[in-house]
A protein has these predicted regions:
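Extracytosolic ligand-binding ectodomains
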Residues: 1-309
Length: 309
């Protein structure tokens, strides 16, 4: 179950659309989407809402009140549970296991810190990023240890960077590799002179570029094999290297099929009008109402006193 914390702009909407399609293809659900003002470093309100902090503290207080009554009646076991509860701030889990935050710098650090303030921590909840996380020394932030983000193949990029530096005595910008690959692909196609240029360009096998495998899809979009990077205390580590070949292309989901998948139980929207957000992300408003089975205040969650250790 995924939550998205995205900027309220075209980039944020693009990330949300891509996340919805990917989630549908991989059989997972997006349960919450929060929008924030681009450039802000104040995430206190949006993270508090997304983490159900008031409801979770309310459940805790209700349980404490119930236990106090039992303690006053002489229940020794209730006293032990109450003592443990006094060391916690909330009761109950959030309805997501992962949060995607396409933000970097001070904004990213502030957002993750506020999630922690409202009792949403790693490793119980994993934080994910986009390629904007690269080269930002995230291992200095203890709250981000264990987080993941994608990046261009470091093995391929290291070779390109070394060759470029040897020629120009400086390191290339990230876009330079794409330009190199585009020229190399055009050159290869010109040499081979294929009878069907469109079929040659959109071959499912793709091409080996200077920054890894890539392929061009019939609709003009492209796919690129990426490393998955984990933030560790000693630095960023590749935990899943970029694929050396592509698997069969998955059929592209239509916007309507994505909308239908969420009609029964749509994601909760924070920081933006619900209908407007749904139209931007899904192409139309969704039919259903929120219901992710969150326990009601004071509901017994186990352990005989609504709490387990």
């Amino acid at each position: 179950r995924f939550a998205l914390l995205i900027p309220d702009n075209k980039t944020g909407v693009a990330v949300a659309r891509a996340a919805v399609k990917s989630a549908q293809k991989n059989g997972v659900k997006i349960t919450r989407i929060g929008f924030y003002t681009p450039g802000t470093t104040d995430f206190s309100d949006i993270t508090k809402q997304m983490s159900d902090y008031n409801a979770r503290t309310g459940r805790l207080q209700n349980l404490k009140n119930s236990l106090k009554a039992k303690v006053n009646a002489g229940d020794a076991n209730a006293a032990k549970v109450l003592a443990r509860l006094n060391k916690t701030d909330t009761l109950g889990d959030v309805d997501f296991d992962t949060v995607l935050i396409p933000e970097s710098g001070a904004g990213l650090k502030a957002a993750v810190a506020m999630f922690g303030y409202y009792d949403v921590f790693s490793p119980q909840v994993k934080f994910l990023g986009t390629s904007v996380w690269e080269n930002t020394r995230l291992n200095r932030e203890s709250t981000l240890i264990g987080s993941w983000y994608p990046a261009m193949s470091r093995t391929h990029n290291a070779y390109f960077n070394k060759k470029y530096h040897a020629l120009f005595n400086e390191y290339p910008q990230s876009l330079y590799a794409f330009a190199y690959d585009a020229v190399a692909l055009a050159s290869a196609l010109a040499r081979n002179n294929p009878a069907d240029i469109d079929a040659a360009i959109t071959t499912g096998d793709g091409f080996v570029g200077i920054s890894g495998m890539f392929r061009i899809l019939p609709d003009g979009k492209n796919e690129h094999s990426l490393d998955i990077i984990e933030v560790t205390r000693s630095g960023d580590v590749v935990v899943d290297p970029a694929a050396k070949k592509f698997s069969a292309a998955l059929p592209e989901n239509s916007p309507e099929s994505a909308a239908q998948a969420y009609d029964a139980v749509p994601p909760m929207i924070f920081g933006k009008n619900k209908s407007e957000a749904e139209r931007l992300i899904f192409g139309r408003t969704l039919a259903g109402n929120y219901d992710y089975g969150a326990p009601a205040d004071g509901q017994d969650n186990g352990g005989g006193y609504g709490f387990s250790f």
